[in-house]
Regions:
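Bacterial Sec-dependent N-terminal signal peptides
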Residues: 1-21
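Conserved, mostly hydrophobic/aromatic
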Residues: 150, 374, 498, 586, ...
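Aromatic- and carboxylate-enriched substrate-binding clefts and catalytic-loop regions
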Residues: 385-572, 576
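Carbohydrate-binding surface patches
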Residues: 628-671, 713-716
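C-terminal beta-strand-rich structural cap/linker in extracellular carbohydrate-active enzymes
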Residues: 694-731
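N-terminal accessory beta-strand-rich subdomains and adjacent acidic, glycine-rich linkers
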Residues: 22-312, 689
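An acidic-aromatic substrate-binding cleft motif
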Residues: 272, 276-369, 373, 377, ...
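Glycan-recognition and catalytic regions of carbohydrate-active enzymes
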Residues: 124, 596-645, 649, 680-686
Length: 731
């Protein structure tokens, strides 16, 4: 149900008006104050339970100076832009419109079946007297946080304009503890650093680790979503929502005054955005609570996005899948078919005359082996990477015509393999690695999607490894952000679901476009084969990267010493086996991969049972215990079955947690199966040590579970039946 009441205080001609406005959250705990500071500078503050969260912070944008106007048919003389134009001062207060809304909506898939969208809104219209330009700042205050954006109505004095920089500030109250990755225009694939804000400059050089494409921009620049904790126990998260036709926002820190200022990703010419009024920016968001669990449970980002754009969503389904992938990531096999050709020319290189290397992973026999295992254990799909021609010189050459997305290698029979998979009751998942040659992908996109239609594919994993073509563009600039959505929308025309890797980090657009069922956009499991990730990584990601949407983290590695897969790779997966099981619950995604090799799962089939059983779509989710960088424990109720699944992970420290079961129905008995670290488990020395126990639990049960260093646990819970009468209580 939605109720909106509109109150407008218009500035009458010649009348005086206060330059300060207040907005409260529906529960009254959050308080926003907007004012015009000296010089007509828009400013805001935010308090939580009468404790300051954001100190007075500036707002607005700087525009590129106007260039001489060109007229069609006139002599063309290209002039340089004039001086930058301010849209951050010189304002007077105009109309203030207030409203409130309280409604619920049902996501196509998600952490819960229904989401409440309740907020109070204030839209402040500002007039810049010297230019006659109007700008509206729209604030929405929820019980869990704040969203605001800049809106530019249609007006003669501001129609086409170019953004030089956004001037939004977030002034912190002190030297907070932050969980951050370096600000970068091209990658989020960094390990997180936990430090005080004042230490970011000192720690930045060590935090910037090599990547296939990276452009750090500042010694104190960080990426959103940024999670912080104040000394007085407030958890503060800064991000953005509904990133459409705009550049990704980073944060640049003034580390003397602890003030963050927005920093937009530039284009090849250094400009930040090309706009045409009427238009608006994405929402800037601040989520805040004195309980870390509230940050994880917040739906602020989703609520600030537009409703679903599709009338029919029946074709969009959660997916549990395996892949011909980990063996390539670890170096056991190759994406490429041959080593005989130093360079590939599509349509010219004759692969029938090339000698196979013998290391090509996507061959008919190997793919069938994966299909057999995946089908036997109830998986929906099998990803196959390296199926298409062009991998011999795909990376590092800024090559435009690199893949055509329709031509298979000689040893990949696309028709026969899809028929074989369908006969076993599963589908193949398409792979479109673009090598960041985006123009090439767009010119082939329609043909690529039609090929998927022809052979029965309904999901695609896309990738953007390397520096972007066109040259000079960045992964997170306005042009690329428009491309990512273009790919998702065109996929929807073919009823195809998209899992985008190396794309911009999510901002809740999966609400509007639910066929965007997965993103990577962070350091995923593949880095465990590239030297490893820190154990605390998975206790931070739900507070940061997952704030904007689910992640295709690709968990489920059971053999931690990578040398057992490829003797030449001495990486180690920094997790216990029980930790890997827990990730299917703690790292929410409607797209979940069992990433390891079939032969590894066959060694631990009792533990693999949890991956078979765990659900993908949820009726409700409860965050039971949480502290960023330390631990997370989550309970989720499966949609349609009433079964519960619980997952817990810890950092590099061993810890014991006491689990409540008060979310279970009163008066009922349940059977719980616990997959836990063995007493001698350790992520470095004994990662495969686990125990499995089954027993009865109820609403009043409390259970102590010990997690090893880098460890965790997983629990499946179902209602008890008469056959379970002899089971003892779980201990």
């Amino acid at each position: 149900m939605k109720k909106i009441f509109l109150y407008i205080s218009a500035l009458l001609a010649g009348a005086a008006c206060t330059a300060q406005e207040t907005l409260l959250s529906p529960d009254g705990r959050l308080r926003l104050e907007f004012s015009l500071a000296d010089g007509g500078r828009p400013t805001y503050t935010l308090d939580y339970k009468e404790r300051p969260v954001i100190l007075p912070s500036g707002m607005g944008l700087e525009l590129r100076g106007e260039a001489p106007k060109l007229e069609f048919g006139a002599e063309i003389r290209k002039g340089e832009p004039g001086r930058p134009v301010s849209l951050y001062d010189g304002f007077t207060l105009g109309q203030v419109a207030r409203s409130e809304s309280d409604q619920t909506w049902r996501p196509v898939w998600g952490e819960q079946a229904e989401i409440r969208d309740r907020y109070n809104e204030m839209a402040v219209t500002l007039r810049q007297a010297t230019t006659g330009r109007d700008m509206t700042i729209r604030f929405r205050l929820y019980d869990d946080g704040l969203g605001f954006r800049y809106e530019f109505p249609e007006q003669e004095s501001l129609t086409y304009f170019v953004i030089g920089e956004e001037k939004t500030q977030f002034a912190m109250t002190g030297d907070h503890t932050a969980f951050w990755i370096p600000g970068d225009y091209d990658t989020q694939e960094y390990d997180y650093t936990e430090s005080k804000l004042s230490q970011i400059r000192e720690l930045m050089p060590g935090a910037i680790t090599p990547n296939s494409s990276q452009t750090p921009f500042s010694p104190t620049g960080v990426q959103t979503a940024l999670q912080m904790k104040s000394d007085d126990g407030l958890y503060i998260n800064i991000h953005e929502a509904a990133l459409v036709d705009y550049a990704c926002m980073h944060l640049d820190l003034d580390d003397r005054n602890f003030i963050f200022t927005s920093h937009l990703t530039p284009d090849a010419q250094g400009w930040k955005g090309y706009m045409q009024a009427p238009c608006h920016t994405p929402w800037r968001t601040v989520t805040v609570s004195d309980d870390a669990r509230d940050i994880l449970a917040s739906k602020l980002i989703l609520n600030l996005n537009e409703p679903c754009a599709y009338d029919d969503t029946s074709w969009i389904k959660p997916v549990k899948y395996m892949g011909v992938w980990w063996e390539m990531i670890t170096g056991k096999s190759d994406w490429a078919y041959t080593r005989d050709v130093p360079s590939v020319q599509l349509g010219v290189t004759d692969y029938a005359r090339c000698r196979p290397s013998g290391r090509h992973g996507a061959n008919n026999e190997n793919v069938k082996r994966y299909i057999d295992f995946a089908a036997a254990h109830g998986f929906d799909q099998l990803l196959v990477e390296g199926w298409n021609v062009g991998w011999e010189d795909w990376f590092g050459h800024t090559k435009d015509y690199v893949f055509d997305f329709v031509s298979p290698y000689p040893d990949f029979d696309i028709a026969a393999l899809n028929e074989y998979a369908h006969g076993k009751g599963i589908r193949l998942m398409m792979h479109h690695e673009t090598s960041a040659s985006v123009r090439n992908y767009e010119r082939h996109m329609e043909a690529a999607y039609r090929l998927m239609d022809k052979y029965g594919y309904n999901s695609v994993k896309s990738g953007y490894v390397g520096d972007i073509l066109p040259r000079g563009e960045h992964h997170y600039g306005q042009w690329m952000n428009n491309h990512y959505l273009y790919a998702v929308r065109r996929a929807a025309d073919h009823k195809i679901m998209v899992n985008a890797h190396e794309a911009v980090r999510p901002t809740g657009l999966c609400r509007t476009y639910p066929n965007l069922i997965g993103n990577e956009s962070a350091r995923g499991t593949e880095y465990q084969a590239f030297g490893g990730s820190k154990p605390h990584h998975v206790t931070i990601l739900p507070f940061t990267r997952l704030q904007g949407g689910p992640m295709d983290y690709t968990p489920g590695i059971f053999v931690m010493d990578v040398a057992e897969v490829n003797p030449g790779n001495h990486s180690h997966v920094n997790a216990t086996l029980a930790n890997q099981l827990a990730l299917y619950v703690t790292m929410y995604s409607p797209l979940q991969m069992a990433a390891d090799l079939p032969e590894h799962y066959e060694k631990y089939m009792d533990a693999f049972r949890f991956i078979e059983d765990v659900a993908l779509d949820w009726e409700e989710s409860r965050y039971l215990l949480a502290e960023p960088g330390d631990y997370i424990v989550v309970a989720r109720k499966a949609k349609g079955t009433g079964e519960w699944f619980v997952g817990g992970v810890t950092d590099e420290n061993r810890r014991t947690v006491t689990l409540p079961f008060d979310y279970l129905d009163p008066g009922k008995e349940y059977v719980a199966t616990l997959y836990a670290d063995a007493p001698d488990a350790d992520y470095q020395t004994n990662p495969q040590a686990y125990v499995i126990r089954t027993g009865k639990v109820g609403q009043r049960t409390e259970l102590d579970v010990e997690m090893a260093r880098g460890g965790g646990f997983a629990i499946s819970i179902r209602e008890a039946t008469d056959a379970d009468r002899k089971l003892r209580r779980l201990k």
